[in-house]
Amino acid sequence: MIWKTAWKNVWRNKVRSLVVIISITIGIFGGVFAVAVMNGAIEQKVDAALNEEISHIHVNDPAFRDNYDIQLIIPNSDQVLSTIKGTPGVAAVCSRTVITGMANTATKSAGVQILGIDPGTEKEVLKLHETCIPGTGDFFETESRYQLAYIGEALAKELNIIRYRIDESVLDSLAARELPAEVLEKLAVFSGKRFKSEKSFKKEVKGVLTMKEQHEYGAAIKEEAWSFRARSKMTLTFMDKDQMQTGAVFRIAGIYNISNGMFEMGQVFVKNEDLMKLTGLAATDYHQMIVRLRNLESTEEVSTSLKEELSELEVMTWKEIQPQLAMMTDMITKFYTIFMVIILAALAFGIVNTMLMVVLERTKELGMLTAIGMNKKRVFNMIMLEAVFLSLVGGVTGIIISKTLISSTAKKGINFASYAEGFEAMGYPSHIYPVISTSFFVTVTVLIIITGILSSIYPALKALKLDPAEALRTE
């Protein structure tokens, strides 16, 4: 009876109830969808880090990460490699030579970490070979008499290996992408012009386009104007095993693009055989072994086993290599719950205000109910149920809308191309696929019910304090 009465009371003032319900719906929808976008970005970041950058476990000399000394190689590397491969749970392992050096072109230079790899085993551990930008080459797949290097897009831009141009073919491509005629006319003034750097290109383009045009079409213009000459050259210089400076000219095998601009800027991959010739290291001298597991959940178990087997070496899991990723994955659920609690706390004030108005408007009615024998517990429960119903209707509607939108955007994703540089500078992808677990919806529903109950306490107590005789005299 109380449940039915409370439900009818919610709709006695439809306008007021709908205002509260709509505000709750918008709040829940915005909160849940924002959480889905953030969760999708973080899951993609972790997935990219494990598949393209660091894999699951690293093995190296205990002092190697302090200064990346070329002398700190893994002793008995063949035996260590065999031990790792024989450990249950290990899917693949690759060996690397790691040295620090400088990458130079005729106009620019940058500090880099040079990684000597075997392309075949590297493909088994990481998927960096799949990130090669079309038209720039490949991952050491084409035979060449030159020494080759596989570099990141950010480094290629810094060294002016990637340049920008605007000509008739670029303008035609932009027209095919349905850019407005007025934008094409503005860009036509640069027809036939080549830009030496991304900075100069952006400066010139910004000079002729409005802020709105830059925001809407900047990413497309940059993509079409992008220019690369196959097998461009750069020089790598570094110290050999005898601490003598050495170096060589490398041709660009390909350019990779991932969502981490810092990684792109600092990591240069070359063939191990080429690097060992230049450094004087032996064919079995490796600084690092990268391990890929069959199952991510077995990381701690496998690392513990390897630490026991390889006690003289440092064995680090991906959580130890990049603790910020570990923190995100471990704390993410708590953070999202706190985020939703803050939103619901703000919405609770609206519910409290509405229920206080309800009590004020129905003072005479509540006094009459008390006078004819309805006890205080029933009055309290009725007010509480009205608040819970308001919260649930708005909350469930918000959840349904957010679930629908998340499902529709999860397949195609949300493209933040206009903010790609900012996202990549922080190591996040600019194309995000929202995702959220079903358990989170359950958590939100429980929080909504709790919000309704807590929001009803003060108004319900106010109702209980009403004197029936005074309330009946209220007009």
Regions found by a protein language model. Give the residues of each.
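Mechanotransmission and gating elements of multispan inner-membrane complexes involved in transport
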Residues: F190-Y336
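The feature marks short, hydrophobic/small-residue-biased sequence motifs that occur predominantly
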Residues: T97-D167, L171-G192, I252, N272
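Hydrophobic, regular-secondary-structure patches
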Residues: G31, V35-Q113, P119-R145
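Short helix-loop junctions at transmembrane helix boundaries
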Residues: M331, N381, V396-T443, I457
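Transmembrane alpha-helical interface segments in multi-pass membrane proteins
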Residues: L356-V358, K364-A410, T443
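Short, strongly hydrophobic transmembrane alpha-helices
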Residues: R16-G40
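A hydrophobic alpha-helix feature that marks transmembrane segments and, especially
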Residues: A34-G40, F335-A371, V379-M384, G452, ...
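C-terminal membrane-exit region of the final transmembrane helix in multipass inner-membrane proteins
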Residues: I436-E475
